[in-house]
């Protein structure tokens, strides 16, 4: 009887030990299995989960616009007063709804090339008004022409054309005209061939961004989605040194197994440069654990604070000898037009930039850019890309409508918020196919290990207790 009991206790301890060992072995084996499956599914080729969602995003993406309506145009033009602006919006468009075009795999270098077509559909139900709403904004053509043509004789000719067309420093335009283009009366009088249509995003519809050529990950999963070339080049030709490099992905996805310590680099054609994001916090997105990465203020710092940014400073006067920060002069990629990009309401910008503008209220929560990334797959499941479009206008002795200005202005025209969030159906699929299976495997591992250890310890204690009684 004693033997049977002892044998049973030993058998229980052995079973517990086996379960614990099996649970322990399952951990690395399970991790390897997960890695193998993920690596297979994030490759950008026909038949994978990644490819299907990459060719045409299943997420609805919206671009909201807030326009800075100028309240005191005459005071500014006559007295060089601070510009008083009133934010109006949002005006919402659906974007990025078109599938990638000319998708071509290259087996030799394991890349895939494509064009990203552009399209925008106005969403009245998500907007405060219509595309016919009027705004008082800086005259884009007058500001640009006076900057591009600085020869005084040429500016005298420009002045006569500006006066003849009855143009001024400011203008009234509809939302549709401001965004997508209008025929400018001043440019229409220029006696030599110039583009007479002006708009902040002209041309947009029926155009495409690219060609992009990205690594498909077949030979090296750590390079998947990373851009090899953009428009056939590895550099942009806008900046000096490392600032001109095309780094990272397009931010729609990143190589799998993202770590919190990583600096995620990505390229944005909207701002004509590569930029980066750093980990901020863990976020639960519809039951899916994601990492929130944000653009840090350091990315917009002056070279004085962040020496890596020295090559983004391209002139000395407006930047106050490269000490100003928070705005990026992208005129080189806008055919010389004095376009400056910043975060909305000049968030993270130096006081000298925003000082001439009244009515701004920078708010980090509302105006910063972030990416919510599922770390195992590297997929961006939610994002908010926020930026502001500004135009530089300077005094001019020869152009009457700019003659009374006593300082330079970086004038905010609008800011945009482009957002996308994984839909409920896609989130359910993602939970069942990815995070659910991983969590289930982890649960099984812990149960086997825990039960095994408890059984082994309990049966061994019982066995020792029984032996002690038997000896007595």
Curated annotation (Swiss-Prot):
This is Platelet glycoprotein 4. Residues 2-7, 462-472 are cytoplasmic. It is found in: Cell membrane; Membrane raft; Golgi apparatus; Apical cell membrane. It is a multi-pass membrane protein. Changing residue 413 to L: In PG4D; type I. The record marks 463 as: Critical for TLR4-TLR6 dimerization and signaling. There is a cross-link at residues 469, 472 (Glycyl lysine isopeptide (Lys-Gly) (interchain with G-Cter in ubiquitin)). The lineage of its organism: Eukaryota, Metazoa, Chordata, Craniata, Vertebrata. Glycans are attached at residues 79, 102, 134, 163, 205, 220, 235, 247, 321, 417. Its main location: membrane. Residues 30-439 are extracellular. GO terms for cellular component: apical plasma membrane; brush border membrane; caveola; cell periphery; cell surface; endocytic vesicle membrane; external side of plasma membrane; extracellular space. One of its GO terms (molecular function) is lipid binding. It is linked to Platelet glycoprotein IV deficiency: A disorder characterized by macrothrombocytopenia without notable hemostatic problems and bleeding tendency. Platelet glycoprotein IV deficiency can be divided into 2 subgroups. The type I phenotype is characterized by platelets and monocytes/macrophages exhibiting complete CD36 deficiency. The type II phenotype lacks the surface expression of CD36 in platelets, but expression in monocytes/macrophages is near normal. Residues 93-120 are annotated as: Required for interaction with thrombospondins, THBS1 and THBS2. Changing residue 123 to K: In individuals from a malaria endemic area in West Africa. Multifunctional glycoprotein that acts as a receptor for a broad range of ligands. Ligands can be of proteinaceous nature like thrombospondin, fibronectin, collagen or amyloid-beta as well as of lipidic nature such as oxidized low-density lipoprotein (oxLDL), anionic phospholipids, long-chain fatty acids and bacterial diacylated lipopeptides. They are generally multivalent and can therefore engage multiple receptors simultaneously, the resulting formation of CD36 clusters initiates signal transduction and internalization of receptor-ligand complexes. (Microbial infection) Directly mediates cytoadherence of Plasmodium falciparum parasitized erythrocytes and the internalization of particles independently of TLR signaling. N-glycosylated and O-glycosylated with a ratio of 2:1. Interacts with THBS1 and THBS2; the interactions mediate the THBS antiangiogenic activity. Upon interaction with a ligand, such as oxidized low-density lipoprotein (oxLDL) or amyloid-beta 42, rapidly forms a complex with TLR4 and TLR6; the complex is internalized and triggers an inflammatory signal. Through its C-terminus, interacts with PTK2, PXN and LYN, but not with SRC. LYN kinase activity is required for facilitating TLR4:TLR6 heterodimerization and signal initiation. Upon interaction with ligands such as diacylated lipopeptides, interacts with the TLR2:TLR6 heterodimer. (Microbial infection) Binds to Plasmodium falciparum EMP1. The gene is CD36. Belongs to the CD36 family.
């Amino acid at each position: 009887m004693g033997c049977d009991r002892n044998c049973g206790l030993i058998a229980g301890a052995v079973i517990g030990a086996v379960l614990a060992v099996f649970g322990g072995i399952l951990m690395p084996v399970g991790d390897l299995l997960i890695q193998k499956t993920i690596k297979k599914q994030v490759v950008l080729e026909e038949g994978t989960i990644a490819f299907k969602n990459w060719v045409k995003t299943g997420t609805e993406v919206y671009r909201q616009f807030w326009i800075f309506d100028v309240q005191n145009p005459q005071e500014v033009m006559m007295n060089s007063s601070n510009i008083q602006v009133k934010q109006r919006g949002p005006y919402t468009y659906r974007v990025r709804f078109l599938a990638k075009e000319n998708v071509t795999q290259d087996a030799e270098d394991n890349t895939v090339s494509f064009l990203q077509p552009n399209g925008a559909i106005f969403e009245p139900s998500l907007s405060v008004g219509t595309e016919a709403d009027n705004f008082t904004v800086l005259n884009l053509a007058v500001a640009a022409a006076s900057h591009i043509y600085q020869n005084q004789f040429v500016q005298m000719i420009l002045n006569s054309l500006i006066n003849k067309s009855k143009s001024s420093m400011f203008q009234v335009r509809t939302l549709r005209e401001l965004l997508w283009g209008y025929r400018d009366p001043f440019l229409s009088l220029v006696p030599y061939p110039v583009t007479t249509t002006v708009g902040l995003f002209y041309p947009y519809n029926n155009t495409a961004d690219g060609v992009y050529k990205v690594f498909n990950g077949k030979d090296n999963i750590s390079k998947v989605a990373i851009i090899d070339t953009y428009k056939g080049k590895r550099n942009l030709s806008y900046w000096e040194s490392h600032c001109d490099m095309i780094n990272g992905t397009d931010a729609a996805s990143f190589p799998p197994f993202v770590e919190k310590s990583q600096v995620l680099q990505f390229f944005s054609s909207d701002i004509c440069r590569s930029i980066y994001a750093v980990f901020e916090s863990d976020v639960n997105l519809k039951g899916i654990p994601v990492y929130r990465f944000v653009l840090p203020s350091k990315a917009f710092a002056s070279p004085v604070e962040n020496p890596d940014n020295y090559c983004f400073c391209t002139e000395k006067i407006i930047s106050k000898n490269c000490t100003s920060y928070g705005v990026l002069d992208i005129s080189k990629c806008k055919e010389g037009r004095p376009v400056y990009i910043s975060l909305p309401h000049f968030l993270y910008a130096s006081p000298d930039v925003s000082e001439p503008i009244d009515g701004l209220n920078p708010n980090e929560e509302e105006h910063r850019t972030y990416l919510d990334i599922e770390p195992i797959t590297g997929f961006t499941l939610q994002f908010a890309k926020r930026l502001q479009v500004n135009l530089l206008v300077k005094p001019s002795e020869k152009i009457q409508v700019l003659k009374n200005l006593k300082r330079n202005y970086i004038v905010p025209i609008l800011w945009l918020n482009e957002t996308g969030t994984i839909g409920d159906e896609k989130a359910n699929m993602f939970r069942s196919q990815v995070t659910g299976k991983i969590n289930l495997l982890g649960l099984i591992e812990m149960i086997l290990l825990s039960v095994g250890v408890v059984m082994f310890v309990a049966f061994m204690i019982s066995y020792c207790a029984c032996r002690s009684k038997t000896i007595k």
